[in-house]
Amino acid sequence: MNGSMRHIYLFSDATGETVERVLRAALSQFRDVEARIHRMSKIRTREDILSALEDVLKEPGIVIYTLVDAELAQLLRDEAEAHGLDALDLISSLLFKLSDFFGVAPQNEPGLLYELNTEYHKRIEAVDFTVKHDDGQDPRGLSKADFVLVGVSRSSKTPLSMYLAHKGYKVANVPLVKGIDPPAELFKVDQNKIVGLLIDPHRLLEIRSVRLKNLGQMSRGSYADYEKIEDELNYCRQLYRRNPQWLVIDVTKRSVEESAAEIIQKLCS
């Protein structure tokens, strides 16, 4: 086998990207082999199968397929066998087991796997964006965010941002500090996607005090001083009033999930 090129044909009713990644992961376990991968995408009719097999027969190899339509899968198996080709079904056994486990039949809709894969990558991109734009990082990217959260330190900006990111939204957050102007970019983006966060001062004092304790800091300073916290929150309220397009949410008695749900409902409807 070493030194000779082998051909592997991937038949998919969608793009074939997912099955190719699975194949490449498997091939990584084989050293000193040469394989050329041919992706046959959007195989959804009898004609598609017969046409693709004509190409396969020019340089025969193994056929690996993920066709959720049972009739098309059977046709491919029969045609492959008739031409002396090895054919491996990557999805039927999985669908059968899941159908038995859940007690329901699969939808057999081509492309669903690709749609799920696309959604997964959307979430990955959203998380990556959100991490890179946490706590005021790179304000130049605010225009690319789906939502921009603003608020004082420890007002749930980061956990709320990450929760939304895992739902596929690109989120940036900007800390509001009295005496320091927010970045100019904040006022240049679509003002309807900005969310101002508020929190009860007593609750914020409690959160910040615990934070300092966990960091081993005995001195509270202005960070955990009630009057200073009131000043910070008053500054936020004044800023929010000057920007009436911003959505304002009080996170005091809300879970991250509840706050995220309101943002999505009010800004995406």
UniProtKB/Swiss-Prot annotation:
Reaction catalysed by this enzyme: N(tele)-phospho-L-histidyl/L-threonyl-[pyruvate, phosphate dikinase] + ADP = N(tele)-phospho-L-histidyl/O-phospho-L-threonyl-[pyruvate, phosphate dikinase] + AMP + H(+); N(tele)-phospho-L-histidyl/O-phospho-L-threonyl-[pyruvate, phosphate dikinase] + phosphate + H(+) = N(tele)-phospho-L-histidyl/L-threonyl-[pyruvate, phosphate dikinase] + diphosphate
Keywords carried by this UniProt record: Kinase, Nucleotide-binding, Serine/threonine-protein kinase, Transferase
Keyword set includes Kinase: yes
Any one Gene Ontology molecular-function term assigned to this protein's record: phosphotransferase activity, phosphate group as acceptor
Source organism, top-level taxon: Bacteria
EC number: 2.7.11.32, 2.7.4.27
Positions with a binding annotation for ADP: G151, V152, S153, R154, S155, S156, K157, T158
Top enzyme category: transferase
Family, similarity comment: Belongs to the pyruvate, phosphate/water dikinase regulatory protein family. PDRP subfamily.
Family matches, as PANTHER family: PYRUVATE, PHOSPHATE DIKINASE REGULATORY PROTEIN 1, CHLOROPLASTIC (PTHR31756:SF3)
NCBIfam families linked: PRK05339.1
Function, in words: Bifunctional serine/threonine kinase and phosphorylase involved in the regulation of the pyruvate, phosphate dikinase (PPDK) by catalyzing its phosphorylation/dephosphorylation.
HAMAP family: PDRP (MF_00921)
Protein name stated in the entry: Putative pyruvate, phosphate dikinase regulatory protein
UniProt lineage: Bacteria, Pseudomonadati, Thermodesulfobacteriota, Desulfuromonadia, Geobacterales
